[in-house]
Regions:
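Extracellular interdomain linkers/hinges and stalk-like, low-complexity segments
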Residues: 38-129, 192-253, 314-366, 435-449
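Intrinsically disordered, low-complexity proline-rich tandem-repeat tracts
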Residues: 24, 91, 98, 102, ...
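Surface-exposed or secretory-pathway low-complexity segments enriched in glycine-proline
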Residues: 1-19, 23, 88, 112-169, ...
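Acidic, turn/loop-rich segments in luminal/extracellular domains of secretory-pathway
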Residues: 2-64, 80, 153-207, 272-321, ...
Length: 449
């Protein structure tokens, strides 16, 4: 017996009973109309009787005069209502559940991840069928607070990131916060879709819920320190190397910065100090190139310089720190004394020579020039005298016998006798000059009378 839109029934005798089999149509779900089954005994009587006004023998109820009618499908002739003692079979077809396996993914810090849950009926059987979301039956995220599906396409999980769903495909994208690492709490994904129709032709749906749990692996950039070697008083540069922890998370452009002693980010130049805390120069950095510059402010200083702290960060904001250390190669100018001889009572002069200090750095010879017009005479206490001021020239006993003057442009020292009767040894004139760094060098000029 076939009921269109529902299925077919097959009955088989089983002694005094009847076996009934219902084979539903492929899309039918819910409660069927059912069938009524009437039996006839050997006398020709049937189960098709009901409220006919006759007393029931050995019936039910207080007076034993009633029976519960089985079938509400049949209305007997001359009966005011439906009901008979016929057999009744009403099958119910349970909707197929939709299932979906949880999804996971793993990628590096800061990078978006995505997965698409697959919804199925009869999963793992020969009748397995994929249920695809659509515009009319969209997949939805489950709000982590209310625990129910939400119409919102994007859900934010504090401290982790945002989940965005494509309702028509079910694809979920997780965009982690740049600083988040580890296994996320995950997000629920729900799909309600039709799995069949009932006897009225109305669609019957089933709902499945699964989860998507991404994991974020940390990315840590690395750094190599830089050093440089330069001549005393010379500006030096060095470029620390910053390397991304992953190709997907490069070092942020323009992020190279200097740090103050306390680790805070410097807003400008940072003092370069000697080990005793004295300022000997300044550090600056070009954020675009990452080049750090050491500019000496005390060009006379030779010795260790406390390294500059240099920091950069990747696109996730993960910071890494290293150092830049300049080394100063000291140079000292040299001097050659001068002598002269002349007759008693005559002025005489000699030219002292000053030569730049030199050093070879990385195979290149470098020098620091003598400062122009820096030659001066020194008094008996070793102090420079003002330009144009003569210095007394004395004999071995401390008696003044003349005066020394100097031409700083030529380094020529002139002895002018004031006691023209004197002959013999004259105490040499002390002459000093300095290079461009301010490093001083001394020599002498000795006249003989």
């Amino acid at each position: 017996y076939v009921v269109q839109g529902q299925g077919k029934y097959k009955i088989t005798d089983n002694g005094k009973d009847v076996d009934v089999e219902f084979i539903p149509e492929a899309n039918f779900v819910g409660t069927a109309d059912g069938i009524t089954i009437r039996r006839t005994d050997a006398n020709g009587a049937t189960t098709g009787w009901g409220l006919n006004g006759n007393r029931v023998v050995k019936g039910e109820g207080e007076d034993g005069a009633t029976l519960t009618l089985i079938s509400d499908q049949v209305q007997l002739q001359n009966s005011p209502s439906k009901g008979s003692m016929d057999g009744r079979y009403i099958p119910t077809v349970t909707p197929k559940p939709i299932t979906a396996e949880p999804k996971t993914s793993k990628d590096v810090q800061g990078k978006a991840q995505k997965e698409t849950p697959v919804f199925k009926t009869d999963a793992g059987t020969d009748n397995e069928k994929v249920i695809t979301p659509s515009a009319t039956t969209p997949a939805k995220l489950i709000d982590p607070v209310t625990k129910v599906p939400t119409e919102a396409k994007t859900v934010t999980v504090d401290g982790e990131g945002t989940y965005t769903i494509n309702p028509e495909t079910g694809e979920v994208t997780f965009q982690p916060l740049p600083t988040f690492t580890g296994r996320a709490k995950g997000i629920g994904v729900s799909l309600t879709a039709p799995v069949g129709v009932d006897k009225t032709g109305a669609q019957v749906t089933s709902t499945a819920t699964t989860t998507y749990t991404p994991e974020v692996t940390p990315v840590k950039p690395t750094a190599e320190p830089a050093t440089s070697t330069g001549l005393q008083g010379e500006t030096q540069t060095g470029k620390p190397t910053f390397t991304a922890g992953d190709a997907e998370v490069p070092i942020k452009e323009g992020s190279v910065k200097l740090l103050n002693d306390n680790g805070t980010e410097a807003q400008g130049a940072v003092p370069a100090l000697d080990p005793n805390g004295n300022k000997v120069g300044e550090y600056t950095v070009n954020p675009a190139t990452g080049v750090v510059t050491f500019t000496p402010t005390d060009k006379t200083y030779v010795g260790p310089v406390v390294p500059a702290k240099v920091q950069a960060e990747d696109n996730n904001g993960t910071k890494v720190e290293t150092k830049y250390t300049p080394s100063i190669v000291g140079v000292k100018p040299t001097a050659t004394p001068a002598e002269s001889t002349n007759i008693q009572g005559e002025a005489q002069s000699g030219t002292v020579a000053f030569a730049p200090g030199k050093a070879t750095i990385a195979g290149v010879e470098k020098s620091v020039a003598i400062k122009a017009n820096s030659a001066v005479l020194l008094d008996k206490q070793g102090n420079p005298v003002a330009p144009g001021t003569p210095v007394d020239a004395e004999d071995a006993n401390g008696n003044k016998v003349g005066e020394y003057t100097i031409d700083p442009a030529t380094n020529t020292v002139t002895f002018t006798p004031t006691d023209k009767t004197y002959t013999g040894t004259v105490v040499p004139a002390n002459v000093q000059a300095e290079d461009e760094n301010g490093t001083k060098v001394k020599t002498t000029y000795t006249p003989t009378i």
